[in-house]
Every structure is written in structure tokens, then in C-alpha cells.
């Protein structure tokens, strides 16, 4: 255990300085680039993590000059960066920011891109290192991957000391198991699997990174992290927002594909996996896959339910139902809410139920993990004065957003002559304790990819294991031509079916 902890501290928390490289963002005019990627790159530059040998090239279909692209990205940084724009830093950074216009399947576009990258290599000393970020709709992934290989933009021979090339793939990685297998086959034929980084931005969040440290660096937690002491676990991911302008995207995905199959499964794996032999990306991945392979199959109604929001009021504002949103079918059967119950069939978690829920247009925005411990077996507090305040289950809450931190709720005697017991809470918050701004997830993930650290990235085998679980559910839903939608009002805590899912076990959801 000591080795794991030491490597955790040395691996996840060691200072990172990125080597020279060119980052090519496919889909550079999209929302992700403006909201997340460019602000992250700007902040890494401001912090001195990216040198003047780093270059960024935006690749997209719209006609645009370098100057216009830089102006648009400057406005994006001003709008979405958590810190105020430093003009001097930006002026330096934008000189290494370029735009390349092409269709994603145009041979000439890739030929001219290759020429441009070679020129930039010479000008900025990027040593031939290339990072390609696929921030496009998923239907373009295979075309781009094939063209990277066809035009020799990706190096298949990446021996130590030679220039490297890597590819970051955004979710969704396929729509189901078959499409994920097809995309994986395309990767196997054109790239090297160990140079492909499947990005899940939840893994870049500070509190998510802290899950393994909380577990394996603290005997007080790891010793009771099992079915002997834990009654059940709840993972909640609630959003107050709807789908906004993403109607076309969400109609093709839904909540299960968008959040559950990836983000929530990663949280579940980190929470439940066995300690890896070393804190190495491959060893961590092996343990996560073991968890995915031991999850029982889901069945509609008994272990997984879905919902869709109707009109309602969110934080005092009247909002439309999902079917009234822009670019959404008026009879849409797409789910905006998923709740499920699962068990993990291994000795550590035998008999412990895990309840997961994720939804849009709910009453509150929050993502947290609640570990509810079993009550003490000792019946020492049954006297009349104690019965007025029943003993509650101890509770560990890992808050991922907002107010990142960890809280422990336990029972304590109230001062006085009567033997009255009440729950109290110890609350750790990142911002107040460390007195520093928590880094954005994409800052960490981009930096790790440039360095070549795969620890916080998922692998293709993980993705397949997750799709194997959920593809039967999606197929069953596709056969249901008339689900009872909408089945929860916007601004609520979700559909009644989700409450029934957990209440039939004599439990209830924690308040959002």
C-alpha cells in the first residue's frame, strides 16, 4: 500500500512542464474549443507550463483567417477563463495560434496541413512532436484517423528519442458496442493504441483525482471500504440546465450515452476498484475493467429507469419541456434522466447496492458521491432520551462540484445532562483549505497528454466493457415506441419511478 500512495503523490501531483509540440484541434470553431480548450491552453501558458516552443493550429471547415481566429479565441478566453486576461501573456500566446481551413475528408487539406506543420516545426522548434485533438462530431472520427495515417501525419514508429504523435478522442466513443468496435478497428488499423487518449474530463477534476488518494492514503477509510461497513452508495449528477442549443446532438445521444456510460461509470470504478499493484496507467485500467466486468446486467424497471423533463420552473424561472426545445422532435423518446441500481459481484462489495442517477433540468446543480455506512451493531442508545433523536447512519460525501471537497457526517452527544445524540459534520473544502483556485479539468488533461501520462485517460478496452453493459439497455429502449414521457417536471428531483427504484429497498435518495 505504501508504494501505491508514494506513487500517487509523485505521479498525480508532481509539477508538470510540457515539452515542445504542435497541437492540432480538429473542429476548432466548435463550442468545446472556445469554452474549454483555448482557456485551458491560455492558463497553462500563463502558469509557465507551455513554452514558446508550443504551437496550436485550429483545423475546421469555416473560412477564416489567422487574425480572425485569434480575435475569436481572445474573446473566448475573456468570456470563459476563470482569471482575468493578461494582455502580455495573450499577445505572446496568439503569435503561436494559427488556423487551417479544410473539410475533414479533403486530401488537399491534409497535404497542406502537413506542409504547414513542417514549416512550424522549423520556425518554433517543436521537434516534430504532434498532438491531434478530435473535437468534432463523432461521425468524422474515422475519416480524420484514416487521413492522419494516409498522409503520414501520425508516426507509427515512435521509438524513444524520436518525435512522437498522439491523438485525443472526445466522447462519445461510438453509440453502442458495435459502433465502438468499428471505431476501435479503425484505430488499430491506422494508429497505435498506446498513442490514443480517450478523454473523460471528469477524470481531470481535482476531487475525482482525490478519490484514490482518499481511499488508499488513509487507513481510516480503506479499512472500512467494504460490505462489512458500507450499507449502500449513491452517485448523483444533477444539472439545472436543459439541452440549450444542443438539440441535434442530444437527440442522437440521450443521457445514458452522454453522461452515464462514461462519466458515472468512471466514478463508480474509481470508488470501488481494488488497489493497483503500482500507480501506473495500465495497472489502474486493469482494476477498473475488473469492476465493469463484475457489474450485473440491467433490466428496465427493476434496475434502471429513464425520464424526460416537461415544462416547469427552475430556480424561479419558467422553462420549456424537452420536447419544446430547439431542434427536438415533438414526440421525442430521448431520455434526459437515468437512475439505476447495480451490484458488484466480488468479495469486497458483496451485497452492497449502488444507486446512480443523472438528469437535466433538476432542482439543483451538483455532482457528489455519498457513502452511507451501516449503523452501529451496539444498541446502547435506546433509552427514552435517546429515542427522541434516533441514531443516523454515518455518511461520507465526496463533492465533485460545486464546492469541491469531502464531508464526514457522524453522531455526537449534545452537551448537557441528557444523553441526546445528534449528527454533526466535518467539512473539508479545497478552496478554503488550500487557498488556491482549483485548476480546470482540461488544463490537467491537456498537460498530461503532451507529457505522455495516460493515468487520467480511459482505454479502448474500458470503453468496450462499459458499452457491453449498456447496449442491451439501449436496444430494449429502442423497442419501446411509447414511453410515458414527459414524466418529471423541470425543477423537480426527477421521476417517481426513480424514487420507487430505491424505496423498494427501504432506502431513499439523499436530497439534491
Swiss-Prot record:
Pathway stated in the Swiss-Prot or TrEMBL entry: Carbohydrate degradation; pentose phosphate pathway; D-ribulose 5-phosphate from D-glucose 6-phosphate (oxidative stage): step 1/3
Keywords: Carbohydrate metabolism, Glucose metabolism, NADP, Oxidoreductase
Reactions that this protein is recorded to catalyse: D-glucose 6-phosphate + NADP(+) = 6-phospho-D-glucono-1,5-lactone + NADPH + H(+)
UniProt cross-references to SUPFAM superfamilies, sorted A to Z: Glyceraldehyde-3-phosphate dehydrogenase-like, C-terminal domain, NAD(P)-binding Rossmann-fold domains
Record region (Disordered): 479-512
Broad class of enzyme this protein falls into: oxidoreductase
Biased composition (Basic and acidic residues): 496-512
GO cellular component: cytosol
One function term, GO molecular function aspect: NADP binding
Pfam families: G6PD_C, G6PD_N
Swiss-Prot/TrEMBL GO biological process terms: glucose metabolic process; pentose-phosphate shunt, oxidative branch
Residues annotated as binding NADP(+): 61, 103-104, 171
Residue numbers binding substrate: 201, 205, 239, 258, 360, 365
Task performed by this protein: Catalyzes the oxidation of glucose 6-phosphate to 6-phosphogluconolactone.
Family as reported in the entry's similarity comment: Belongs to the glucose-6-phosphate dehydrogenase family.
Entries under HAMAP family matching the protein: G6PD (MF_00966)
Name this polypeptide is given: Glucose-6-phosphate 1-dehydrogenase
Amino acid at each position: 500500500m505504501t508504494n501505491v500512495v508514494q506513487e500517487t503523490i509523485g505521479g498525480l501531483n508532481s509539477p508538470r512542464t510540457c515539452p515542445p509540440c504542435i497541437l492540432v484541434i480538429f473542429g476548432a470553431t466548435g463550442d468545446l474549443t472556445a469554452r474549454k480548450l483555448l482557456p485551458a491552453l491560455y492558463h497553462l501558458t500563463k502558469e509557465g507550463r507551455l513554452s514558446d516552443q508550443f504551437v496550436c493550429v485550429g483545423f475546421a471547415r469555416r473560412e477564416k483567417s489567422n487574425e480572425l481566429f485569434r480575435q475569436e479565441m481572445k474573446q473566448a478566453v475573456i468570456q470563459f477563463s476563470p482569471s482575468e486576461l493578461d494582455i502580455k501573456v495573450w499577445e505572446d500566446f496568439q503569435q503561436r495560434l494559427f488556423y487551417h481551413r479544410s473539410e475533414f475528408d479533403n486530401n488537399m487539406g491534409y497535404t497542406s496541413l502537413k506542409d504547414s506543420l513542417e514549416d512550424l516545426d522549423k520556425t518554433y522548434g517543436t521537434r516534430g512532436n504532434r498532438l491531434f485533438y478530435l473535437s468534432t462530431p463523432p461521425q468524422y472520427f474515422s475519416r480524420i484517423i484514416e487521413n492522419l495515417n494516409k498522409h503520414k501525419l501520425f508516426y507509427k514508429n515512435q521509438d524513444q528519442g524520436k518525435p512522437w504523435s498522439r491523438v485525443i478522442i472526445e466522447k462519445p466513443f461510438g453509440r453502442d458496442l458495435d459502433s465502438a468496435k468499428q471505431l476501435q478497428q479503425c484505430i488499430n488499423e491506422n494508429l497505435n493504441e498506446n498513442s490514443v487518449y480517450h478523454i473523460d474530463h471528469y477524470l481531470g477534476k481535482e476531487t475525482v483525482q482525490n478519490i484514490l488518494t482518499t481511499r488508499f492514503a488513509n487507513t481510516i477509510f480503506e479499512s472500512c471500504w467494504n460490505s462489512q461497513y458500507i450499507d449502500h452508495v449513491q452517485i448523483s449528477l444533477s444539472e439545472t440546465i436543459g439541452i440549450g442549443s444542443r438539440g441535434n446532438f442530444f437527440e442522437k445521444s440521450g443521457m445514458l450515452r452522454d453522461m452515464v456510460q462514461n462519466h458515472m461509470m468512471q466514478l463508480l470504478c474509481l470508488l470501488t476498484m481494488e488497489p493497483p499493484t503500482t500507480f501506473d496507467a495500465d495497472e489502474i485500467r486493469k482494476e477498473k475493467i475488473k469492476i465493469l466486468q463484475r457489474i450485473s446486467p440491467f433490466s428496465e424497471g427493476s434496475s434502471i429507469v429513464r425520464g424526460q423533463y416537461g415544462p416547469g420552473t427552475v430556480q424561479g424561472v419558467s422553462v420549456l419541456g424537452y420536447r419544446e426545445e430547439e431542434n427536438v422532435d415533438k414526440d421525442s423518446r430521448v431520455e434526459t434522466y437515468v437512475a439505476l441500481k447495480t451490484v458488484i459481484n466480488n468479495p469486497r462489495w458483496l451485497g452492497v447496492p449502488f444507486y446512480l442517477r443523472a438528469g437535466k433540468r433538476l432542482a439543483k446543480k451538483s455532482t457528489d458521491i455519498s457513502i452511507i455506512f451501516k449503523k452501529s451493531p451496539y444498541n446502547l442508545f435506546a433509552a427514552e432520551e435517546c429515542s427522541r433523536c434516533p441514531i443516523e447512519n454515518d455518511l461520507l460525501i465526496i463533492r465533485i462540484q460545486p464546492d469541491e471537497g469531502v464531508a464526514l457526517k457522524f453522531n455526537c452527544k449534545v452537551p448537557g445532562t441528557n444523553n441526546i445524540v445528534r449528527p454533526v459534520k466535518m467539512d473539508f473544502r479545497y478552496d478554503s483549505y488550500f487557498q488556491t483556485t482549483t485548476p480546470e479539468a482540461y488544463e490537467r488533461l491537456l498537460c498530461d497528454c503532451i507529457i505522455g501520462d495516460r493515468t487520467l485517460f480511459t482505454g479502448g478496452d474500458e470503453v468496450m466493457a462499459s458499452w457491453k453493459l449498456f447496449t442491451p439497455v439501449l436496444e430494449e429502449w429502442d423497442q419501446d415506441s411509447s414511453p410515458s414521457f414527459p414524466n418529471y417536471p423541470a425543477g423537480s428531483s426527477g421521476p417517481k419511478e426513480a424514487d420507487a427504484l430505491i424505496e423498494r429497498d427501504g432506502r431513499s435518495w439523499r436530497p439534491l
